[in-house]
Curated annotation (Swiss-Prot):
Entry keyword annotation includes Transferase: no
Catalytic activity: N2 + 8 reduced [2Fe-2S]-[ferredoxin] + 16 ATP + 16 H2O = H2 + 8 oxidized [2Fe-2S]-[ferredoxin] + 2 NH4(+) + 16 ADP + 16 phosphate + 6 H(+)
Source organism of this protein record: Methanothermobacter marburgensis (strain ATCC BAA-927 / DSM 2133 / JCM 14651 / NBRC 100331 / OCM 82 / Marburg) (Methanobacterium thermoautotrophicum)
Subunit comment: Tetramer of two alpha and two beta chains. Forms complex with the iron protein (nitrogenase component 2).
Name this protein carries in UniProt: Nitrogenase molybdenum-iron protein alpha chain
Disulfide partners: none
Amino acid sequence: MPFELFGVDAEIPDRKKHIYVKKQGDPEGDIPACNTTTIPGCMTERGCAFAGAKGVITGAIKDALHVIHSPVGCTAYGYGTKRYPTSQEMPDGSMFPIEKFNLKYITGTDLSESDVVFGGMDKLKRCILEAVREFPEANAVYTYATCTTGLIGDDIDAISREVSEEIGKDVVAINAPGFAGPTQSKGHQVANYTLFEDLVGTAEPPRTTEYDVNLIGEYNIDGDLWVLKKYFEEMGINVLSTFTGDCCHDEIKWMHRAKLSLVRCQRSANYIAKLLEERYGVPYMKVDFFGIEYCRKNLMAIGEYFGIPERAERVIEDRMKKIGPEIQYFKDKLRGKRVWVFSGGPKNWHLPRPLEDELGMEVVAVSTMFEHEDGYEKIKKRVREGTVIVDDPNSLELEEIIEKYRPDIILSGIKEKYLAHKLGVPCILIHSYENGPYIGFEGFLNLARDMYAAIYNPVWDLLEFEEDVN
């Protein structure tokens, strides 16, 4: 059978259907069970729906003020959770007055017991008004329901409409309390639909060209967006709107004027791309810029769509001249090294082929926190026989994967990093990079360089482990 029960899950046999080992000849539909509530007893690594909305989708918007309607814990959780830097430049050429506003500030209602008993809507209104007085530079306000306010039934939509009329600015209510879905993926969906229904089509861009695109699902993690925008600028393509890396609130309003939507993260933002096509006729193309071949193929596809393939070829040729020799050096150093990829969703099927085909590494394990069935089908097609694919792994499973599959390096998030280090395995953050960008040609070189530096760091030779007395 292709499904396996880890030893640490002996008391939770239902975990078996979430752990799949690829074997030749397996039925096409054999994939891990996914997008379901975490099994009680598992120490999950997942985030909540609120994290998916604020931490992924809206938190990257450079000129919006965020008001979390919650006890203080959710507000703290919503702060500084991603490395998505922003520039101060606005689409009309003006400059937003506060540098990295989205990373520096967050506000919350700090609900108390009495607010839970008697309702917190008045407090929410006061908090929004106070925040706007404190930060008049903000061009919009985003308010968020959380588990507590969702359970007591506070109507954040009504308060948002009321305050919007009072202050003359958009106040967008995001109803994605933590319990809204089994993973943060539900928060992505709620935020996509909310921003589309409330904002898209309500304003016009300062200018348009015949090569306007929306870059959707690109959150500018440690500068990824700026790498891609440079490619497009050299091709003569204008990024009209991004969703939502380094974007301003108004950019979302004129997404309907693009000639094409490019969907980068196909788990968190495919919803708005489909809505734009259905209502406004904006076609979309799913793209992948991780690794050399995927980047080359997708730049060519975009160039061919607009009838300018020669421009894409020039960009590709220029970058390959710059990175070719160094990539070969790191391939020689990384060949045969075993890697475990553990990300939220799509990077698990973006990365295996480039790591194996272009760096000579062996992907021994892939695991995700919130991938859906279509994503697991892609993962299954892109990994080799014997690779273990795990949905929603718990903390004890992480240890067993390390002990059983012996990865030389793990590409994961901050929650897994220090556990890996304690077990003597180097780890690179692949969600919110510590040393990116990792996208595009030069980004893939950065990733190769960082993996080399992590694996060959002499500190791993200095670690001492106690013998297992059992």
